[in-house]
C-alpha cells in the first residue's frame, strides 16, 4: 500500500526522468539546440569531439540529453550511447541537400540497432530559416521515414538559433514517452 501511494505521489508531483540521445551529421546544429534548450540562449560552438550531456527540465520532465559529435570518424562511437535510450533526436540540416542521403543512411543504420528498437524518433529538420531549406515533406521522403514500420516518429521543423520548433518537439517527445 505504501509503495502504491508513494509511486502515485511521485507520478503527480515528481519529475519524470528520460534519457534522450541526440545525433546527426556534423554541423547540423545539435550543440546549438542543446544549449538553446538548456540556457535559452545561443552559445558559440565548435565541432563536438566526444559528447556534451545536459539535463533539460521541461514540463515536469527531466530530459538527460546526450549530444554526440557527428563527424564521420566518430559516428561508430554512437552505438556506445544507445543503451537505455528512450528517445532519439536526429538532427538534420534542412539546407544541406548534398548530404541528405548520407544522413538517411546513418539514420537507417541506427534504427536497425537492437538497443534502439523501443526508442521513439524525433527528427529535428533544423535551419528552416534558410531560404533553400527543404520542406518537411521532401525531408520525410529523402530520409525514407514513410518506410519505418513499428516505429513511432515525428518530424519537427526547427531553427535552433531562434529556438523555433524546439519546445514543440519536446512536447511531442514527452507526450509519446509518457504513454509508455
From Swiss-Prot:
InterPro entries: Arf1-5-like, P-loop_NTPase, Small_GTP-bd, Small_GTPase_ARF, Small_GTPase_ARF/SAR. Its main location: Golgi. The modification Phosphoserine is found at residue 147. A lipid is attached at residue 2 (N-myristoyl glycine). GO terms for molecular function: GTP binding; GTPase activity. It is a lipid-anchor. GTP binds at residues 24-31, 67-71, 126-129. GO terms for cellular component: cytoplasm; Golgi membrane; plasma membrane. GO terms for biological process: intracellular protein transport; regulation of cilium assembly; vesicle-mediated transport. It is found in: Golgi apparatus; Membrane. Keywords: ER-Golgi transport, Golgi apparatus, GTP-binding, Lipoprotein, Membrane, Myristate, Nucleotide-binding, Phosphoprotein, Protein transport, Transport. NCBIfam families: small_GTP (TIGR00231). Forms a complex containing RAB11A, ASAP1, RAB3IP, RAP11FIP3 and ARF4; the complex promotes preciliary trafficking; the complex binds to RHO in photoreceptor cells and promotes RHO ciliary transport. Belongs to the small GTPase superfamily. Arf family. GTP-binding protein that functions as an allosteric activator of the cholera toxin catalytic subunit, an ADP-ribosyltransferase. Involved in protein trafficking; may modulate vesicle budding and uncoating within the Golgi apparatus. Part of the ciliary targeting complex containing Rab11, ASAP1, Rabin8/RAB3IP, RAB11FIP3 and ARF4, which direct preciliary vesicle trafficking to mother centriole and ciliogenesis initiation. This is ADP-ribosylation factor 4. The gene is ARF4.
